[in-house]
Structures are given as C-alpha cells and as structure tokens.
Amino acid sequence: MIIMNTKKMLFIVVISIITIQSYSQNSNEFRIYYGFSDSELIRDVSLVGAGSQYAENSKEFGIKYLKQLKNNLSIELGINFLKSDLILNGAPMIPAFPTTYEKLEMISIPIYANYTLWKYLFVNGGPILDFQITENSIDSQSGIGYSIGFGGKYDFNNFLIYINPNYKRHAVLPFEKENYHQRLTEFGLQFGLGYKF
C-alpha cells in the first residue's frame, strides 16, 4: 500500500515537473534592443518671449523580460537607457544668453502589457518610471510617464527578431513639478533580438 502510494506520488511529481518545465519554456522571454527617436520638449502652454529648447539625436538601448500571463498576454518589464542632445536657445530679447548644448541621460523602467495578435504582430504599452541622471537646464524628466506601441516579430527556434515603433511621453507625473513643466515626447523605433526559455 505504501509502495503504491509512493509510486503514485512519484508519478504525479514527475508529470508536474514536466508540465511546469514545458510551460516555463513557452512563458519566459528575454530581449535586448537598440532604438532611436524623434524627440521634442513640449509644454502644455506656449510661453511668449521665453527661450527655446530642443532634443535631438535621441538614442536608447535596453533589456526586457516578458512573462506570459495568458495565451496572448504577457507582462513586459525592463530597464532602458536614453541619451539625447539638448540645444538651449536663450530668450530672443536677451542676447547675453547664447545658445548652449547639453547631454540628457535617463534611465527608465517600463512596466508594460504586451498582447500578441495572430503570430507575427503585437501591441504593448503602459507606465514608465523615469530617473534623469544628468543635471540639465530643462525641467526634470524624472517621474512617471507612459508609452504605447505596436510591432512585428519573427520566431526561429527559441530566438526571435522584432521591430517596435512606439510613442513615449515622460514626466506626465513629475517627481519635481515646475510651472508649465516641459515633457520629453518621443516617436521612436526599436530593433531587438529575443530568446525564449
């Protein structure tokens, strides 16, 4: 009787391990990516007589981890590094403030939902937690923002390649709020490689 129960228990454990392992192989994904974006510093209102600030040459790279929650739905977590060139023009009525140039660097933690459509397409989006790591003359971009995107992917064995056009808006809820707060806005494109395990 004890031997029979032990065999049943061993059988259940082995089946459970095989099931968990096969589920795990389909439910985890690691991605690395590189991207660039057309960036702009936007205020909610236009300030007359103020200087102008521009963001150019925005580039990013990062890693992502996707955990499958349901058949087509995954949670997408990661860490992203953004670098951008800032061009700061003084107020037109004050010639003593010439044009200056700065580097903006920021680390972001995206927390997205990722939904696969059919086999080769997906949509993703959600909040972003941003930490500006450079001191700049623009309003701080540290805070909570959001992103929405769509993309295409192609799987081969356990690997995949993908492309992900996206829209991001930073500092929607800034940690340090200023009057007429500037918000970095990006229309970007990411290229990446993934591995399923």
Question: What kind of region is each of these model predictions?
Answer:
Residues 29-33, 74-78, 122-124, 160-164, ...:
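Residue-level detector of the transmembrane beta-barrel scaffold of outer-membrane proteins
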Residues 23-78, 168:
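Short glycine/proline- and aromatic-enriched beta-strand/turn motifs that initiate or cap beta-hairpins
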Residues 61-67, 79-81, 109-115, 125-129, ...:
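Residues on the lipid-exposed face of transmembrane beta-strands in outer-membrane beta-barrel proteins
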Residues 25, 68-72, 118-120, 155-159, ...:
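Outer-membrane beta-barrel channels and translocator barrels
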Residues 1-31, 197:
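Bacterial Sec-dependent N-terminal signal peptides
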Residues 26-28, 55-61, 103-107, 140-146, ...:
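Residues that define the transmembrane beta-barrel architecture of outer-membrane proteins
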Residues 40-54, 83-106, 131-140, 172-184:
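Flexible, solvent-exposed loop segments that connect beta-strands
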Residues 29-31, 154-157, 183-197:
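Outer-membrane beta-barrel "beta-signal"
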